[in-house]
């Protein structure tokens, strides 16, 4: 059963759930808390690679990822990021989120943005128990027009679901956690699998 707005506020007040900066009360509604777009992005660079062999040797996968991903792009607050039709880009939430070991989070994009073709997460919308860090957004523009995205705009909403008990292996205590304490638009670390 997901937390209602009253319980999200209670968990925030008690410090069991942390969203920093904390959303104002008008951004916690029904069963969600809104999150905003940060100012860090990554895009795919122009490249001539025919493919990336994701099951190849780790060093080759790592080198291929380095060739196709841009360095982190940090926008000033007054600039916009343009996402063109058919483009995939990584971005990050302005907020950092910390979940306890007995709570899982879910990120959903906004319906109003989806109706313009913007996918906020391609597939990865679960936020594991024990998570701490910013949330990377996998943007895809499936629409017909470029979309101007501004840092600080409301980009999605988080909902939270209590578990039947505390996880034995929460994200923050896993040795193989590739995105622990994530800050910024971190690109794929598939080569660390």
UniProtKB/Swiss-Prot annotation:
GO biological process, one term: nucleobase-containing small molecule interconversion
Biased composition (Basic and acidic residues): 170-179
SUPFAM superfamilies from the UniProt entry: dUTPase-like (SSF51283)
Region (Disordered): 168-193
Reactions listed under catalytic activity: dCTP + H2O + H(+) = dUTP + NH4(+)
PANTHER family: DCTP DEAMINASE (PTHR42680:SF3)
Name of the molecule in the record: dCTP deaminase
Organism: Photorhabdus laumondii subsp. laumondii (strain DSM 15139 / CIP 105565 / TT01) (Photorhabdus luminescens subsp. laumondii)
Gene designation: dcd
């Amino acid at each position: 059963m997901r937390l209602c707005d009253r319980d999200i506020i209670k968990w925030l007040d008690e410090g069991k759930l942390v969203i920093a900066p904390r959303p104002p009360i008008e951004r916690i509604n029904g069963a969600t808390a809104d999150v905003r777009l940060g100012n860090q992005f990554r895009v795919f660079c122009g490249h001539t690679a025919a493919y990336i062999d994701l099951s190849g040797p780790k060093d080759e996968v790592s080198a291929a990822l380095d060739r196709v991903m841009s360095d982190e792009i940090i926008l000033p607050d007054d600039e916009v990021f343009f996402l063109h039709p058919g483009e995939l880009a990584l971005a990050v939430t302005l907020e950092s989120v910390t979940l306890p070991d007995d709570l899982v989070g879910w990120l959903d994009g906004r319906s109003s943005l989806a109706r313009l073709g913007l996918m906020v997460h391609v597939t990865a919308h679960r936020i594991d128990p024990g998570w701490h860090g910013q949330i990377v957004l996998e943007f895809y523009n499936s629409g017909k027009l470029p979309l101007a995205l501004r840092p600080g705009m409301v980009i999605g909403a988080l909902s939270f679901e209590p578990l039947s008990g505390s996880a034995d292996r929460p994200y923050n205590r896993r040795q193989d956690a590739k995105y622990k304490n994530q800050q910024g638009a971190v690109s794929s670390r598939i080569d660390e699998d």
